[in-house]
Regions:
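Carbohydrate-interacting regions of secretory-pathway proteins
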Residues: 1-166
Length: 167
């Protein structure tokens, strides 16, 4: 993404946009180069939850990159949270969100909260009234890795299953 080279506006009025995951969890897009704004509204913040670890913004007009790794929350059919969501973000190759635990949806006007939703869904680009360009958007699905203790059990079960099918 890139904000315009000619700087107009300040704070949240400069290159304001966002990447929405499942329509509920926003990674903020903002021209944060020499631009003061609230800490959890900067570029690469998890909006209204976590500021970036560092400001990795390039100058206005230069292309920025985000690598976003999203582990969707798991919400039971009864609406109870089974597992929170997590987001990792690299901004221009710099780690700025390190497996940050989502507190719920990212809202500008109320505290975060989880509400039931599908485990898979849309990735949306927010239009917030400011010009922002986008190119080369890629989406890849990663298989979920099991924690080491669960992986050992899963591997043992596979091994037992293979042995039981041999004649």
């Amino acid at each position: 993404w890139a904000s315009p080279a000619k700087v107009e506006g300040n704070g949240q009025g400069r290159g304001n946009s966002g990447v929405y995951l499942l329509g509920k969890y926003e990674v903020q897009i903002l021209d944060s180069f020499d631009n003061k704004t609230y800490f959890d509204g900067q570029a690469a913040s998890i909006y209204k939850q976590y500021p970036p670890l560092v400001n990795a913004c390039r100058k206005p007009g230069e292309w920025q990159t985000y690598d976003i790794i999203f582990n969707a929350p798991r919400i039971e059919k009864d609406g109870k949270l089974a597992r929170p969501g997590f987001i990792t973000v690299l901004h221009n190759g710099v780690l700025v969100q390190n497996h940050s635990e989502l507190q719920g949806g990212t809202f500008y006007d109320r505290p975060p909260e989880y509400k039931a939703h599908p485990e898979k869904g849309a990735i949306d680009i927010q239009f917030h009234g400011n010009p922002v360009q986008f190119k080369n958007i890629w989406v890849r699905e990663f298989k979920e890795l099991l924690p080491p203790e669960k992986a050992k059990v899963a591997n043992k079960l596979k091994e037992l299953d293979r042995k039981s099918t041999r004649l």
